[in-house]
Amino acid sequence: MRSKQFFFIVILIVVFGSCKKTEIGNPGPNEVWLEYKAFNPTQIQVDSGSTITFTNKDNADHSVTANSGLFNSGKIKSGNTFTFTFNTKGTYYYYCNYHSSNSSEQGAIIVK
């Protein structure tokens, strides 16, 4: 009986030990993720001339639209990206057209 329990435990270790782990990470320094109907991070600071990549990691469609009208991604489907280069110093506020009532779907890029 003991050998059956040992064998069963070994099998469980092998099966679960070989399962792929999904890592939950964070965006890179010039990256904003659209996930869980929110921007992550909601605020980012970059140098003038920096390009920011917005990546939709959510199942829902999103957009990245500047309050000033400077940029508008249009619809960003799941898994797609939008990039924009910020050449002028200032603070640029943006939101998602699809979820603009959600305060988590608003953000700011601070260009130094």
Give residue ranges: language-model regions.
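Non-cytosolic beta-sheet module surface loops
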Residues: 36, 55-58, 98-100
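Beta-strand cores of secreted/periplasmic/IMS beta-sandwich domains, seen most often
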Residues: 42-58, 81-88
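N-terminal, post-signal-peptide metal-ligating segments of extracellular/periplasmic oxidoreductases
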Residues: 24-53, 111
